[in-house]
Structure formats: structure tokens, C-alpha cells
From Swiss-Prot:
<dbReference type="InterPro" id="IPR039812">
    <property type="entry name" value="Vesicle-fus_ATPase"/>
</dbReference>
<dbReference type="Pfam" id="PF17862">
    <property type="entry name" value="AAA_lid_3"/>
</dbReference>
<feature type="compositionally biased region" description="Basic and acidic residues">
    <location>
        <begin position="1"/>
        <end position="13"/>
    </location>
</feature>
<dbReference type="InterPro" id="IPR041569">
    <property type="entry name" value="AAA_lid_3"/>
</dbReference>
<feature type="region of interest" description="Disordered">
    <location>
        <begin position="1"/>
        <end position="37"/>
    </location>
</feature>
<dbReference type="GO" id="GO:0016887">
    <property type="term" value="F:ATP hydrolysis activity"/>
</dbReference>
<keyword id="KW-0067">ATP-binding</keyword>
<dbReference type="GO" id="GO:0035494">
    <property type="term" value="P:SNARE complex disassembly"/>
</dbReference>
<dbReference type="GO" id="GO:0043001">
    <property type="term" value="P:Golgi to plasma membrane protein transport"/>
</dbReference>
<dbReference type="InterPro" id="IPR027417">
    <property type="entry name" value="P-loop_NTPase"/>
</dbReference>
<feature type="compositionally biased region" description="Low complexity">
    <location>
        <begin position="17"/>
        <end position="27"/>
    </location>
</feature>
<dbReference type="InterPro" id="IPR003959">
    <property type="entry name" value="ATPase_AAA_core"/>
</dbReference>
<keyword id="KW-0547">Nucleotide-binding</keyword>
<protein>
    <recommendedName>
        <fullName>Putative AAA family ATPase R476</fullName>
    </recommendedName>
</protein>
<comment type="similarity">
    <text>Belongs to the AAA ATPase family.</text>
</comment>
<feature type="binding site">
    <location>
        <begin position="610"/>
        <end position="617"/>
    </location>
    <ligand>
        <name>ATP</name>
    </ligand>
</feature>
<dbReference type="GO" id="GO:0005524">
    <property type="term" value="F:ATP binding"/>
</dbReference>
Length: 855
């Protein structure tokens, strides 16, 4: 028997909350209470004052040595009594006759009636009390976790425990049901204040603690009536590398078996349970389809022995559910995320990626991400496509025969190199760009600094790049580097490698392996290294026309045989043009100083005239390449674009043509690099001036151009090439010696020229072995008389399209089919020649009709 000091009990009492009842119910309770006390005063025959002790149990009896009667009354509450002897304990307290034992809930009920420390008035209770048809109770618990109890079983337990006891409203009763502590509070006994519990008394629940889940009936349901969600999946073994182990790809049939094992007994709607297999713990959430959630008591359910599958969905990234499996022949990945802060680490290697995927992932799905760890970075790859594709829920098996590739067309900051060891770089060209950090204001209103001329010293640039740009690099590799306190973006625009064993053919490998390696080399970039012997060049981006790079320290090397170099790109060069090309290159090559010392003036302007399509623009562009005029030092423009609607705007555009060359000449003198400007349709910009009847704006443009080209300011680092179909329309002052003094007619090519043009435009087809054996270029040159270079180029393209159309009609297309049925034949060329002739005749006919209309 647990005895406690009353004063300690009183100090530890917690404040009680009084429940709100309606005014009508308050009046009824008051009347019942007065009636109960009146009857009690008339019938009670014995009243005593006793010391009490408190027990820690849920026994609803009050214990005394010699009970006054079967029931006693303390305050407003009536309790059934038992003798101390029934406790089966030996007591030797002389004052035991004057003591009474209460449990904790009984003490809480009567504590307001305690006086003189720990004494209470006890009276015998002999009134006849009617049996209660029902009682309404509240359930509470002291636990901090949820537990489930069955409604009917709990009611039976309460009735069995309180059978024969008298209860009153607001009485608290402690019970321990299935090991769970609960407190019952009587809130209603019908119309009476007091009642007796019998085996037929019905128990109703009013309020239930949230930690007590009272379940209703158990219902048998089939697998189709439930949905299961896999909410969590964790590893129980800390030694495993979870980044590699997850996500787990598992077939739905296997996970169905796990679910059935997990919910093999009764469960409730929205129940959570765990299942462990192979050190992996799965958490499942089961929901009953069509379950009424707006009920006071939950039903319990049990799955029938059903062979149909359960609807299962994974809500965690750690598990991917699949249906069926298939061996993957080809898988293509793309980069889902990137790290822009580490440009030196953005070069990945094809073989490393393939080895990682095949060794770490033996199965994959369409929607799965692959995490590739390199250094301190995590790179995420995702499957772009899988062949053969069944559906998105299929598990694809990866083995050594699976061909792995990567989509390099999707924009990413990563580069995939086909070679593991870097190849020594002979020459690398960097493009310099503005770092583009001006923000929204610059984007909307422009940046004034972008028009200012910025001159870069190539020597200083080279030192800066060698020290700060990654030595190991690839094409399009970029990094932000400071130069003279300003940050610019340097992009690898072009790379020329030294001859390396990696680029040589391997005679020992079979043709199949060689073809596979060739495809990899074509698709992925080449990994190179910048050494002390690497030649470094710089060109500004097209958007940064005001950037001027001083390459005077290392002059551009001009070929000693420029005509032969030019014939690689242009066919049908005339003798007259050969002479001009040699003169141009001689005055800008290694004999430049000797050329000037003899009093010879470098050629400043050339007019190329002739019918359209004869290659005048192409000739000019390739002539600029031979002279080293690339990037910002080569400008191709159209004559009409020079005109501006604002006063003085056209003249300002003329000055802008000559400004870069003049600025470079002022800084470097005769060591300045060569600039080239090609003006197409120059007759629209420099038309003949017609005195007072002319257009004053056009006349002003001509005057400004002549002043810039041949004015007081001397500079010999600019070559200006004008292109026109109508030489006679040009102003006579522009085509005199010292300005555009050289006039070369580019006419339709002769037969020998057409052969060379065909050789140039069929070069790629020959390299790919896509020309049929019956194709004779000499015969093609014969049947294309009066064809311009543009006509021949269009003819080659059209013939190639014809062969592709034949391929497109076939059901199966592979390398063997292309090599057999995809070759460009002589018939394709003749068909293309007829179509071009037809289009030319149609165009001439239309032109004649238009002339007739005007006449």
C-alpha cells in the first residue's frame, strides 16, 4: 500500500479545467444534486471521519478494514467498498480502523472535501439506485504516443470493470486496458445525477484523446480496394555508399510481395508501417479507396488472399518502381546540372564516364538520374533516350555490350573529350568577349563603354592567359580573366594540334573497332594541353568590334605561294588576279620593309566586278584569310547599309570603317597588322556624282569616303575591296590610281576553272566516300558551260539532296545501306544541272517580261 504525505500531495496538485455546460443542463444537475443530498441525509445512518491513503492502481473499489456498508459516500461521489483483508496483505497498524484507501482518480474527485490535513468525512450509502441504461464518457491518456483499441472490446472491458459500481457525473475512473493507461470521465447518465453500472449498460464516447485511436468493425477488402505509397527508403548499414546504392530500382511484383508481408494483419486507413529486407528499410502508407474519413471511429481492414496486384506508387527519390525488364543496346545521356565556378574541372573523359556507368549501374530507367562524382563535384546525368524503348516504366539492363553515348548538342558547361591523355597544342586562338555584367540598365539603355576602342597588347595578353587560363583545355572552353583591371571572357575558338599517335590509324584494330573510334573522335572534343611551345593568338568577338588586338610583335606569316593557297578555296583564278594576289602578299609579307624602302606604295583598293554568282565575295573572304585579316581585322559589309536617316549619320558610318585601322597605325606605325574591308554593292555607296542635279547626301558620302581613304592622314595597313556588277556606275574619282586603282573582272569560269570548283565543292563527299564511281568531274565540267561558281555549288548540294531522298524511302538505314544506296551518282548531278538550267531560264524569262512591261 503506497502511503503519501497529504501536504506533499496537495502541493503537487495540478489545476483542473471546468467544463462548460448549457444553462438548462446546469439547472437539471442542480435539481438532481439537491434531490440526491436530501435523500442521502434521510437514509444515511452512519458518518465517520477517517484518515486516508492513496494507492497507485486502477482498482475502482475503496478499501477499509471494516466497511460501513457495501457503498460509501464521500462528498458527491459514491464508491463500492472492500475490506483491507481482500488485498491479501498483512497490516499491523493500530489505527487501521480509522483509515480509508483511495486510488489516484478517487482522490482527485474528493480532494475538495478534505480537511484537517488528510481527513475526510465518510458516510454509509444504502439508497436504492436505479441501473443506468447508458453512460457517456470522455477518454484521456497520459501517453505521448498513439495506440489503437477496438471499440466493442473497450466497452466490454469498461462494463466488466465497473459492473455493480455506482457512478456519478464528473467522476474520474482510471483503467489500464491492454497495458495502455486511460482515464474515464463520466459526463452523462441520462436524466439522473447518479446511476448503477450493470452488464446491460451501454457505453457511449463523447470526447476521445487524440492519442487514443478507437477502431470500429474489421472489414475484409481486396487488393484493388487499397492504394499503397512508398514514402521512405533508408539503408540500415552505415558502411554502404548510399550515393551509389540509391536509387533502388525494383520491380512492382517484388514490392507487392513486401507490401503483403507488411500488412498481413489488420490495419486502418492511412496506416504507416515499415518493412526491412537486405538492410533496407521501406516505409509504406496504405490508404483504403472510398474510405469515409469523416467518422468518429475508424474501421479496421484485412486484405483477402487475393492474387491481383496492389496499386503502389513511390513518393521517394530513393526507389524507382518498374514493370518488366529489357536489355539496353544503346543509351544516350545528357548533363542535367552544371558547375560554372570551376572551368578547369569541366572537362570530362568519355572512357571514364562509360566505365563509371557500366561498373556502378547494372540497371537503369528512362526517368533515372545518374550521379557522377569527380573530385568535390557531383555531376548529374539523365537518360536522353534508351534503345530499344519499351516504355518509361521498364527496367533496362546495362552490360558490356551496351553502347553508351552523350548528347553534346544540349547546352552545358561540361565538355566530353574522347582522349584520356592530352594532345600537345600547336596553335590556339582565343576569342575575347565582354564579360556581360552590366545588368538590366545596360541591357535596356546600352553601355557607353562598349563603343570605346580598347587596344590589347598581344604580348601582355599571352603572359596573362598562360598564367591564368587552364593549361589543359578543349574547343569552346572559357574562363573569365582580368586584363588591366577589367574582367574579360576568353573562349577557345580554334585549336590546331601537333601530330600525335592518337590521331594515327591503328592497323592492329579491326574495321569495326576503328569505325567506332572514328565516330567517338568526330562526336566528342579533343583534349589538349598548352605548352611553352604553343602559339597563342587572339581575336575579338563579333559583338565587340571596338576591340583592337596588337599582334605586331608576332607578324602574321603570309604564304610564299599565295595563289596556290587561294586555289584551295577558290577555283578558276585568272592570270590577272594571280598577279594582283602576289603583289598584295608581297607588300604585306616578310619583304614589307624592302617593298616600302624602294618607294613602292602598297595596294589600298581593288574593285572586283562581273556577273553575279562568280565568287567575288568568296574570293575576298579567302584573300583576307591568306593575309591574316581575321576577326576584328576583317569586315564584310553591304554598300546600302552605310546610309543613316540622321544628319551626319552616314558620314559617321564611313569614318567607323577606317577607324580601327587608323587607331592601330597611330599606335604601331608600319608594324601595325593588316585590316581588310570588303564592300558588296559598292556602286550603291559610291555612285557617280552628277553636279547640281545629284543627291547631296550621296555626294557627301562619296566625299567623306575619298577623304578617309586618300586624305592627309597616311596609313598603309588597310585593304579595301569593292564588289559590283556595274563598274560604270562608280564615281570616276573613286576608281583612279591610289584609291580603287585595280579593277579585276571575275567572269564565268572556263572548263578548267569549273573542274577546280567541282573539286572544291565535292571535297567533303570524297572524304566521306559518298561519290559513286561513275562520277567524272571532267564530264561535269563539260555539261555545265555558262555555269557560275554559285551554280556549281548549288548543283552539288542538289545532287546530294537527291541521294538523301532515296535513303529516306528505305525502311532500314545504317552505315552499310548508306554506303550502298546513299552514294551521289552521275545521274544525280545531271538531274541537278537540268533543274538549275530550268530555274535560270525561268528567271531570264521573268526578267524579259518585266522589261517588256516597263517598255
Amino acid at each position: 500500500m503506497n502511503k503519501r504525505d497529504f501536504s506533499e500531495l496537495k502541493n503537487s496538485e495540478s489545476s483542473e479545467e471546468s467544463s462548460l455546460v448549457s444553462s438548462t443542463e446546469t439547472v437539471r444537475s442542480s435539481k438532481r444534486n439537491k434531490k440526491f443530498h436530501k435523500n442521502n441525509r434521510q437514509s444515511n445512518s452512519f458518518i465517520i471521519s477517517l484518515n486516508f491513503t492513496i494507492r497507485n492502481d486502477d482498482d475502482p473499489f475503496v478499501y477499509m478494514k471494516n466497511p460501513l456498508s457495501e457503498f460509501i459516500k464521500i462528498g458527491n461521489f459514491v464508491y463500492k467498498t472492500k475490506s483491507f483483508v481482500s488485498l491479501d496483505k498483512d497490516y499491523h497498524d493500530d489505527n487501521l480502523d480509522w483509515k480509508i484507501s483511495l486510488n489516484r482518480s478517487q482522490y482527485d474527485d474528493v480532494k475538495d472535501f478534505i480537511y484537517d490535513k488528510n481527513r475526510v468525512i465518510v458516510s454509509s450509502f444504502t439508497n436504492e439506485i436505479q441501473s443506468s441504461c447508458f453512460i457517456k464518457v470522455e477518454l484521456s491518456t497520459s501517453t505521448h504516443y498513439k495506440f489503437r483499441v477496438t471499440k466493442n472490446e473497450l466497452i466490454n472491458y469498461i462494463v466488466r470493470t465497473l459492473n455493480g459500481h455506482i457512478v456519478t457525473i464528473d467522476q474520474n475512473i482510471d483503467i489500464h486496458y491492454m497495458g495502455y493507461p486511460m482515464t474515464i470521465n463520466i459526463v452523462n447518465i441520462g436524466d439522473d445525477f447518479i446511476g448503477k453500472i450493470t452488464g446491460s449498460t451501454d457505453v457511449h464516447f463523447k470526447n476521445i484523446d487524440s492519442n487514443i485511436v478507437v477502431m470500429n468493425q474489421c472489414i475484409d477488402i481486396s487488393n484493388k480496394d487499397v492504394s499503397v505509397f512508398l514514402t521512405k527508403c533508408i539503408s540500415l548499414n552505415s558502411n554502404h555508399d548510399n550515393n551509389i546504392r540509391f536509387p533502388i530500382i525494383i520491380d512492382k511484383k517484388i514490392i507487392n510481395r513486401y507490401v503483403k508481408n507488411t500488412f498481413d494483419d489488420t490495419f486502418t486507413d492511412n496506416d504507416y508501417r515499415t518493412y526491412t529486407c537486405d538492410d533496407i528499410e521501406y516505409t509504406f502508407n496504405i490508404k483504403v479507396i472510398g474510405c469515409n474519413t469523416q467518422t468518429k471511429f475508424k474501421n479496421t481492414y484485412k486484405l483477402l488472399d487475393d492474387s491481383s496486384p496492389i496499386q503502389i506508387k513511390s513518393n521517394t527519390d530513393n526507389v524507382i518502381l518498374t514493370s518488366g525488364k529489357k536489355k539496353a543496346k544503346k543509351i544516350c545521356f545528357y548533363f542535367q546540372s552544371s558547375n560554372k565556378d570551376s572551368p578547369s574541372d569541366n572537362i570530362l573523359f568519355y572512357n571514364d564516364l562509360v566505365d563509371f556507368i557500366t561498373s556502378k549501374y547494372n540497371k537503369i530507367t528512362c526517368n533515372q538520374s545518374v550521379k557522377y562524382l569527380t573530385g568535390s563535384k557531383e555531376i548529374v546525368l539523365k537518360a536522353d533516350f534508351i534503345s530499344p524503348h519499351i516504355n518509361d516504366n521498364t527496367m533496362y539492363i546495362i552490360d558490356s555490350n551496351t553502347k553508351i553515348s552523350f548528347n553534346t548538342d544540349i547546352k552545358s558547361s561540361y565538355f566530353i573529350a574522347h582522349n584520356d591523355k592530352p594532345t600537345e597544342i600547336d596553335t590556339v586562338t582565343f576569342k575575347i568577349k565582354n564579360n556581360a555584367s552590366g545588368g538590366l540598365f545596360s541591357l535596356m539603355f546600352g553601355d557607353d563603354d562598349s563603343e570605346k576602342t580598347v587596344i590589347f597588347d598581344s604580348g601582355k595578353l599571352e603572359k596573362t592567359v598562360r598564367s591564368k587560363f587552364p593549361k589543359r583545355t578543349v574547343l569552346k572552353h572559357k574562363a573569365s580573366i582580368q586584363y588591366n583591371g577589367v574582367t574579360y571572357q576568353f573562349v577557345v575558338q580554334e585549336i590546331k594540334f601537333k601530330e600525335d599517335s592518337d590521331n594515327k590509324s591503328d592497323n592492329k584494330s579491326d574495321n569495326k573497332s576503328k569505325n567506332h573510334l572514328d565516330k567517338i573522335k568526330k562526336k566528342y572534343t579533343t583534349y589538349g594541353i598548352i605548352t611553352s611551345n604553343t602559339n597563342i593568338k587572339f581575336v575579338p568577338a563579333k559583338a565587340n568590334k571596338s576591340y583592337v588586338i596588337n599582334n605586331s610583335v608576332e607578324q602574321t606569316e603570309i604564304s610564299k605561294n599565295p595563289v596556290q593557297e587561294l586555289e584551295k578555296y577558290v577555283g578558276g583564278i585568272s592570270k590577272e588576279l594571280e598577279t594582283v594576289v602576289r603583289t598584295l602578299c608581297l607588300s604585306r609579307g616578310i619583304l614589307k620593309q624592302e617593298y616600302l624602302a624602294r618607294g613602292l606604295r602598297p595596294v589600298k583598293g581593288i574593285i572586283l566586278h562581273g556577273p553575279p554568282g562568280t565568287g567575288k565575295t568568296s574570293l575576298s573572304r579567302n584573300l583576307g584569310k591568306i593575309l591574316g585579316c581575321e576577326g576584328d581585322r576583317f569586315r564584310l559589309m553591304s554598300g546600302p547599309e552605310i546610309f543613316n536617316k540622321w544628319v551626319g549619320g552616314s558620314e559617321s558610318n564611313i569614318r567607323a570603317i577606317f577607324k580601327p585601322a587608323k587607331d592601330a597605325w597611330k599606335k604601331h606605325g608600319d608594324k601595325s597588322p593588316v585590316y581588310m574591308v570588303v564592300i558588296d554593292e559598292i556602286d550603291a555607296m559610291l555612285p557617280s556624282r552628277s553636279g547640281s542635279d545629284g543627291n547631296p547626301v550621296r555626294d557627301s558620302v562619296v566625299n567623306q569616303f575619298l577623304a578617309e581613304m586618300d586624305g592627309l592622314e597616311v596609313f598603309n595597313n588597310l585593304i579595301c575591296i569593292g564588289i559590283t556588277n556595274r563598274l560604270e556606275l562608280l564615281d570616276p574619282a573613286t576608281i583612279r590610281s591610289g584609291r580603287f586603282g585595280i579593277h579585276i573582272k571575275i567572269d564565268l569560269p572556263d572548263q578548267e576553272g569549273r573542274v577546280k570548283i567541282f573539286q572544291i565543292h565535292t571535297k567533303k563527299l570524297q572524304e566521306l566516300n559518298r561519290l559513286s564511281d561513275d562520277v567524272d568531274i571532267s564530264k561535269l565540267a563539260v555539261i555545265t558551260e555558262e555555269f557560275s561558281g554559285a551554280d556549281i555549288e548549288g548543283m552539288v548540294e542538289l545532287a546530294s539532296v537527291y541521294s538523301l531522298e532515296r535513303l529516306n524511302k528505305l525502311d532500314v538505314i545504317n552505315d552499310d545501306v548508306i554506303n550502298t544506296h546513299g552514294l551521289v551518282t552521275f545521274e544525280d548531278f545531271t538531274k541537278a544541272a537540268k533543274e538549275i538550267n530550268h530555274n535560270k531560264n525561268k528567271s531570264d524569262s521573268t526578267k524579259d517580261n518585266i522589261n517588256h512591261m516597263y517598255l
